[in-house]
Amino acid sequence: VDIEQYGTRVKRVASKFIREDERASIASGDEIYALLLHWSAKETMFKLMEEEAVDFLDHLRIFPFTLRESGVMEAQEFRSSTEQKFLIHYDTHPDYVLTFACLD
């Protein structure tokens, strides 16, 4: 589970966690919510992984999705030998975004 407060600060650090192949999802909707959801989803993935030295830019990917008030996005980590896939559920609210996932 991860919750991120709504705010524009995320734009200043986006280059540290947004991959080139993730930019399409950000361009297709509300930029702040899309960035916050990417960050929050990657935090959720990180919390479920049993790996150290995870680089959010190089090791975690959110696949393209259409931004809605709530939904599910597919993601994958590339840090471990299993390169685990995730289904990350999300909700957006005026003040925050929430993401959560479970391991199979």
Report residues per predicted region.
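Core catalytic alpha/beta fold that binds nucleotide/phospho-ligands
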Residues: 1-104
